[in-house]
Amino acid sequence: MKTTIIGCGYLGFALAEKLQKKHHFLTCTTVNPKSIEKLKKTTQKSLIMRGTDKNELSLILENNDTIIVTVEAKNSDEFENTYLQTAHTIKECAKEIETPKRIIFTSKTSVYGNLEGMWADESTPLKAKDDFAKILIDTENTIFSLNDLGWSVAILRLTQVYGGENHEIIDLFKKSYKEVMPGHKDYYTNMVHRDDVVGIISYIIDHDIKGIYNISDDEHPTREEFSKKICEKLNLKMPKYDPTLADFSDNNKRVANYRIKEKGYQFKHPRRII
């Protein structure tokens, strides 16, 4: 199978390693020149390219069966260009391609907005109010509209991904730890191990699954409960939480994962590894 991964970074590279072992012919793109040599060891073709480069993207889409979009914005200034404009470029190219493709897009559960602690499943209305989440919603809609061109579309709404490459929970906590942390202490946390995101994408390809799916593990401790476990392990002072310090849209929800389980996927890490 000919497969391309557009935006091969933290998640995309792990996915490339998985698919390479399953004998996919891989074309992977990155915007980071430092990643090229690493990608060359895993892929048949790798190139530096932005998702808005229509000429390059058109060739890639034409020559591959499965397109996986795992782009990630480096900063807020690049958010719209990285997500929405990439989606628009893909759709422009798709209109010129005769053979329908399969596309898998990794979105985020921030599209649900603040649900005040309620559960979010795939039927939950998208009520996000911050600009970044609105861009993701528009991006999802653009990708989903490829169904009209006969494409097979899967959208994965990821919670916070951890695992591997200095992204273990302990590593992430150490980087953000302060005696006073931003946010509400009683808000729920939602995470998923990178192994499961990679496993789910591979499973979706193998079983020709389409639609929208939340990707989260089974645990939803509050920030306070979660921090307590980590602080006990690291022998750190338990932080306090101050909502007024948050420079982000502080959303409270529990993300349900039953729909992907109903498709037969079994989580490798249903509980968090601390």
Please give the residue ranges for each predicted region.
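N-terminal Rossmann-fold NAD(P) dinucleotide-binding loop
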Residues: G12-F13
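C-terminal amphipathic/interface module of NAD(P)-dependent oxidoreductases
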Residues: M49-K54, D247-I274
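NAD(P)-cofactor binding segment of oxidoreductase domains
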Residues: N64-I104
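Conserved Rossmann-fold NAD(P)-dependent oxidoreductase catalytic core, especially the SDR/UDP-sugar
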Residues: T89-D131
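Mid/C-terminal beta-alpha module of Rossmann-like enzyme folds, strongest
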Residues: V198-I200, D206-N251
